[in-house]
Swiss-Prot record:
Structural protein that is not essential for the viral replication either in tissue culture or in its natural host. Confers a small growth advantage. It comes from Murine coronavirus (strain A59). GO terms for cellular component: virion component. It is found in: Virion. Pfam families: Corona_I. It comes from the Viruses. The keyword Oxidoreductase does not apply. The gene encoding this protein is included within the N gene (alternative ORF). The gene is N. This is Protein I.
Length: 207
């Protein structure tokens, strides 16, 4: 007698009972559309892709499902596959949103690097007559950091220091040559900028 009694309190429903309760809220016509295979009883909740299965699966409550909104297609993407050129529209979008557009076709990002901000602030203060203290220029800061790095390499040995110094010098020469070509290309004809003679790799001492 005591073993046949059920325990008092809430009991956990079985999987079959959960599926039956959820299926009662779905119309029979909708179940026939979602499950065309006869004999398969599988309620499909919106927002989930389910394949017909002969096994009974546990699904979540229909009331807890959220609507999955499809991403809106932009006008540029809708015109992409029909042969319409959207380059001009994209450039106008970039000009108005994230960058400044120059007539020569160069985009300048609004957010500048942290190392350029002190120089710009100093230049503004000099032009307005509000400069009170002289700041350390950026090349001196870069050179001081490079000197500290080379000194640490010298502590490790002469060979890594010589290798790094040679790499630095080659990169500096490459940058100087590129800068000279860039200046000649951007300046109009008739204006000649006197550049210092750039030493070649042959005139540099071998480290």
């Amino acid at each position: 007698m005591e073993s046949s009694r059920r325990p008092l309190g809430l009991t956990k429903p079985s999987v079959d009972q959960i599926i039956k309760i959820e299926a009662e809220g779905i119309s029979q016509s909708r179940l026939q559309l979602l499950n065309p295979t006869p004999g398969v009883w599988f309620p499909i909740t919106p927002g989930f892709l389910a394949l017909p299965s002969s096994k009974r699966e546990r699904s979540f409550s229909l009331q807890k499902d959220k609507e999955c909104l499809l991403p809106m297609e932009s006008p540029l993407q809708s015109k992409r596959d029909i042969g319409i050129d959207t380059t001009a529209v994209l450039l106008k979008h970039l000009m108005g949103s994230r960058s400044n557009y120059c007539p020569d076709g160069i985009f300048t990002i609004l957010a500048q690097g942290p190392m350029l901000e002190p120089v710009m602030e100093t230049a503004l203060k000099v032009s307005s007559g509000l400069q009170t203290a002289k700041r350390t220029p950026i090349p001196a800061l870069i050179l001081s950091k490079g000197t500290q790095a080379v000194m640490r390499l010298f502590l490790l040995g002469l060979r890594p220091a010589r290798y790094c110094l040679r790499a630095f010098m080659l990169k500096a020469l490459e940058g100087l040559h590129l800068l000279a070509d860039l200046v000649r290309g951007h300046n109009p004809v008739g204006q000649i900028i006197a550049l210092e003679a750039v030493p070649t790799s042959a005139s540099l001492p071998l480290l």
